[in-house]
Amino acid sequence: MDLIKAVESQQMRKDLTPFNVGDTIRVHYKVIEGDRERIQPFEGIVIKKSGSGLRETFTVRRVSYGVGVERTFPLHSPRIEKIEVIRRGKVRRAKLYYLRKRVGKAATKIKELM
């Protein structure tokens, strides 16, 4: 095992819930405003997972007041408090960019995994 992989493996988090593209998740993210620190939940559909190891990221999309909001999180960030899987989704694509073109209820409609 080379030196970079050894250092990365120490910093990777093992306490996170596994999830896939198409799942509806709630990410509890630590936000620091001045000297205060609070936890801000962000709920939406996972439209993309990319990278591997310590550099792995995922993008969550939700529609808020008719406007699509996407947020990309580093998976192994210490600012992520926890990840809750609300619904498991069944999709046949690795990237769900087609949801960006949809409006209304169709933007959040994904088959549920039983």
From Swiss-Prot:
Keywords: Ribonucleoprotein, Ribosomal protein. One of its GO terms (cellular component) is cytosolic large ribosomal subunit. One of its GO terms (molecular function) is structural constituent of ribosome. SUPFAM superfamilies: Translation proteins SH3-like domain. GO terms for biological process: translation. NCBIfam families: rplS_bact (TIGR01024). This protein is located at the 30S-50S ribosomal subunit interface and may play a role in the structure and function of the aminoacyl-tRNA binding site. Belongs to the bacterial ribosomal protein bL19 family. This is Large ribosomal subunit protein bL19. It comes from Thermoanaerobacter pseudethanolicus (strain ATCC 33223 / 39E). The lineage of its organism: Bacteria, Bacillati, Bacillota, Clostridia, Thermoanaerobacterales.
